[in-house]
C-alpha cells in the first residue's frame, strides 16, 4: 500500500481519544443548535412580532428538513469520504445558525434556519456511521450511550445558554453556538478516520494486515435494507416514538408558562423555566446505565437490547403524565434577577418545595426509563446492518424520527393553542403534552417485534462479514 506518510502518533490511542472527543463535541453542538430557539419562544416571538405557534411551525420544519437531508448525507457517507462530508455539513449549519442570529423578521429567521437544517443532517447519519466503526459489538450499547448522551447534553446546554443569554437578545446564544461549531469543524480535520468495520471482530485480521474494506453501498442494494425485518421495526418505532419525543421540546415553555402564571415577568419566567427544564432533564444521564444493561442482556440473548428498550419506553408513560401536571405552588425567586441569583434559588426550591421536588423526581424517573431507547436503538442499527449500510439505514430511521418529531412538535403547539380557548396557560400545554404520550404504546410494540426478528438478522450479518474477511474483494469463495 502507498500513501502520504503520517506522523508516528497518527492513529494511536491518544489520537483516537482526541478524535472521539472532538467528534462527540460536534454531535452535542448540532443538538444545541436545534434546541436553542424552542427555549427562546417568548423573546423570539416578541422581537419578531410573531406567534408562538409560528415559531413551532418553523421548529418543526427545521427538524423535518434535517431528517430529509440526513438520508442523502447518510447514503453518500456510505459511498465516499465521510470526513469531508462531516466538515462541510458542520460549516453549513454553523453558517445558517450565525445568520439566524441577525434575523430581523420571521421570514429571515425561517430562511436561515432552513440553511441550518441542511447541514444538521450530516452529523446525524454520517456521524453515526463513523462512531459505529469505533465501537465493538460487545460494548455497543455503553459506547452509544455516550454518543446519545452527548446529543442530549448538547440539547440541554443549548437550551440553557439560549434561555439565559437569549432572554434579552435571542441572537447572542446563536452566534456563540455557530462559532463553536465552526471551530470544532476545523479541529475535526486533524482527527483519525476509522476504516469501515474498524472494530468488527470478523474483520480484525483484515485491518491488521492493512487491507481495505472495499465494500460500498449502491442504489441496487437499498431494497435489501427493507427486506431485513428488524430495520422495518426500528424505522417504524421512530415514527411513533418521536410523536411523543417531539412534543417534549415544549417542556421548557410549559415550565416558563408555569412560572409566568405565578406573576413573574417574561424575562424571569424565561430564565427560571429554562433553568428548571435543564435540571429536570438530568434523568437522561441514566442512558449510560441503560446502554450497559442492554449490552449485558444482549450477551445473554440476541433479543436483549430490544426487550430493554420496550420496557423502558412503556414504563415511562405514567411518570411523564404526573410530571406535566405538577404545579409549582410556592415557588419564590427574585424577579428580574440574573442567572447567578436565580440558579441557587431554583436549587433551594428543589429541596424545600415539595411541588418542585415532585416535578424533579417524576421527570427523573420518566427520562431514566426512556433513556433505554436511544443507546440500544443505535446499537441495534449497527448490529443488524453491514458497515457500508449503517449510515443509510440510520438516515432512513432518522427520517422516520424527523417526521414523527416534526409532527409531534407542531401538533403539540397547535393542540395547546386550541386548548387555550378553554384552558388557560400552563394547563393547555400540560394537556397537549399528555395527549401525545399515547404514541409511546405502538413504540413498545415495535420493539417487541424487533426482539423476535433481530437474532436472525444479527447472525446473517456476522456470517457475511466472516466470508468477506476470507475473500475481501468479493465476499464469496472464488469459482
Show which residues each predicted segment covers.
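Cytoplasmic helix-loop-helix junction between adjacent transmembrane helices
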Residues: 112-152
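Residue-level signature of mid-helix packing/kink "hotspots" within the transmembrane helices
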Residues: 35, 63-71, 121, 155-156, ...
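Helix-breaking motifs and short loop linkers at transmembrane-helix boundaries and internal kinks
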Residues: 49, 81, 102-108, 119, ...
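Conserved MFS/SLC helix-loop-helix module at the cytosolic interface between two early adjacent transmembrane helices
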Residues: 68-106
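Juxtamembrane intracellular "pre-TM" segments in multi-pass secondary transporters
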Residues: 2-13, 198-235, 346-349, 466-476
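Structural signature of the two symmetry-related core transmembrane helices
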Residues: 84-98, 304-321
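Extracytoplasmic gate region of multi-pass secondary transporters
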Residues: 37-38, 229-283, 287-288, 374, ...
Amino acid at each position: 500500500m502507498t500513501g502520504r506518510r503520517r506522523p508516528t502518533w497518527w492513529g494511536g490511542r491518544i489520537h483516537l481519544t482526541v478524535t472521539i472527543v472532538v467528534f462527540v463535541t460536534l454531535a452535542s453542538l448540532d443538538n444545541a443548535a436545534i434546541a436553542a430557539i424552542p427555549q427562546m419562544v417568548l423573546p423570539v416571538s416578541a422581537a419578531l412580532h410573531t406567534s408562538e405557534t409560528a415559531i413551532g411551525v418553523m421548529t418543526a420544519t427545521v427538524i423535518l428538513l434535517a431528517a430529509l437531508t440526513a438520508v442523502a448525507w447518510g447514503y453518500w457517507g456510505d459511498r465516499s469520504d465521510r470526513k469531508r462530508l462531516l466538515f462541510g455539513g458542520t460549516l453549513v449549519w454553523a453558517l445558517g445558525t450565525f445568520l439566524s442570529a441577525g434575523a430581523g423578521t420571521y421570514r429571515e429567521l425561517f430562511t436561515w434556519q432552513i440553511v441550518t437544517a441542511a447541514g444538521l443532517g450530516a452529523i446525524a447519519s454520517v456521524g453515526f456511521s463513523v462512531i459505529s466503526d469505533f465501537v465493538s459489538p460487545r460494548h455497543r450499547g455503553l459506547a452509544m450511550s455516550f454518543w446519545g448522551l452527548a446529543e442530549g447534553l448538547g440539547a440541554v446546554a443549548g437550551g440553557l445558554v439560549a434561555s439565559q443569554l437569549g432572554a434579552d437578545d435571542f441572537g447572542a446564544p446563536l452566534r456563540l453556538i455557530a462559532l463553536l461549531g465552526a471551530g470544532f469543524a476545523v479541529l475535526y480535520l486533524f482527527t483519525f478516520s476509522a476504516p469501515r468495520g474498524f472494530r468488527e471482530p470478523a474483520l480484525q485480521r483484515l485491518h491488521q494486515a492493512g487491507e481495505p474494506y472495499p465494500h460500498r453501498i449502491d442504489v441496487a442494494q437499498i431494497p435489501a435494507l427493507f427486506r431485513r425485518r428488524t430495520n422495518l421495526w426500528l424505522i417504524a418505532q421512530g415514527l411513533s416514538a418521536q410523536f411523543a419525543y417531539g412534543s417534549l421540546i415544549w417542556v421548557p415553555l410549559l415550565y416558563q408558562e408555569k412560572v409566568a402564571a405565578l406573576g413573574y415577568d417574561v424575562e424571569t419566567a424565561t430564565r427560571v423555566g429554562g433553568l428548571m427544564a435543564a435540571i429536570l432533564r438530568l434523568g437522561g444521564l441514566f442512558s449510560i446505565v441503560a446502554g450497559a444493561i442492554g449490552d449485558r442482556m444482549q450477551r445473554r440473548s440476541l433479543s436483549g437490547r430490544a426487550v430493554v428498550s420496550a420496557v423502558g419506553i412503556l414504563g415511562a408513560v405514567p411518570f411523564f403524565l404526573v410530571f406535566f401536571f405538577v404545579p409549582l405552588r410556592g415557588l419564590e425567586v427574585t424577579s428580574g434577577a440574573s442567572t447567578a441569583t436565580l440558579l441557587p434559588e431554583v436549587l433551594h426550591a428543589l429541596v424545600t418545595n415539595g411541588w418542585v421536588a415532585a416535578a424533579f423526581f417524576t421527570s427523573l424517573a420518566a427520562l431514566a426509563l426512556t433513556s433505554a431507547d436511544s443507546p440500544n436503538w443505535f446499537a441495534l442499527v449497527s448490529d443488524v446492518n453491514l458497515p457500508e449500510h449503517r449510515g443509510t439505514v440510520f438516515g432512513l430511521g432518522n427520517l422516520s424520527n424527523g417526521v414523527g418529531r416534526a409532527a409531534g412538535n407542531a401538533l403539540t403547539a397547535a393542540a395547546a393553542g386550541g386548548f387555550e380557548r378553554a384552558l388557560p396557560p400552563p394547563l393547555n400545554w400540560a394537556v397537549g403534552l399528555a395527549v401525545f404520550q399515547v404514541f409511546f404504546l405502538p413504540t413498545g410494540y415495535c420493539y417487541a417485534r424487533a426482539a423476535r426478528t433481530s437474532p436472525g438478522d444479527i447472525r446473517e450479518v456476522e456470517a457475511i462479514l466472516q466470508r468477506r474477511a476470507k475473500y475481501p474483494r468479493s465476499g464469496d469463495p472464488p469459482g
